[in-house]
Amino acid sequence: MPTRLQGVLALRKAMKKFEPDLAKETTKEMAAFLKPVTRQARGYIPSNAEIMSGWLKRPNAQGRWANRYYDAAQVKSGISYKTSPSKPNRRGFRALASIFNKSAAGAIYETAGRKSGLTGNFSPRLGGQLKGDKQKMTGRAIFRAFEEDQGKATAGVIKAIESAAAKFNARTKK
């Protein structure tokens, strides 16, 4: 999944400053490759009837537990993408584009059981296999959709950035 590209942040800042139309076009191209993966990941989210019984909304819940429940519609709408660069991690790497789940229940469904695998009481009943290469790069919906995409999204985002760089260099050399 991770791919190393250098100079992309400087390119995007320069495009935003000198060629804003090219920056918008690049963002649209990147989004076109991320949207199918996002749509496919939403399809892997189980309905309210398929999820474990303790996760559904309780009518008599009060306090902090009043807002902590699983709702399939909320989880599906929480899966989205962004094309803006992330903050650097402790090793200095950034994500130029990412697909993530905003909802807490969706994030738990995605990542539960990464360490324990199928040995815990909680994660085997969630259903869905953990897909991905490494322990930190596994999940049930987003990572499964990304794995089935077979790198088309990554290649498309890189191609969009490279074509934007070529267009930007051609426009600024005049």
Question: Where are these predicted regions, by residue range?
Answer:
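Short helix/strand-capping connector loops at secondary-structure junctions
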Residues: L130-D149
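C-terminal or internal capping secondary-structure element at the end of a domain, subdomain, or sheet
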Residues: R144-K174
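Disorder-to-helix initiation segments
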Residues: M1-P20, Q135
